[in-house]
């Protein structure tokens, strides 16, 4: 993860280049840490969602499975309860959703599949937008969003 972070941070300082989100996902999937001998080995044995924005493709979401395979999605659920959550996302997601509506869909999906009551103590919420970049919601922002459900 540190390698992806430092790679993405370096690109703003290169005037004519920007890192594509799919390139970061590929780098993670290859297990690339700069050592070519280690490429294509099983990276970390974890599932990961990688979200980002680049000038070429806009907002993107990639899923990397424990083997390092990555796939691009519009909406994706991983972890406990992911089958039910993914079904709900496939039925309800639309590219015409506003950011607020997409956030509400994510939270209502979590509410449906989580065993314990959804609260600011057991969820995190983040978003990636072209104008504001990456933002992790504060507890106050999450409380406000949960109030809309």
Spans of features found by a protein language model:
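Long, low-complexity N-terminal extensions
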Residues: 1-149
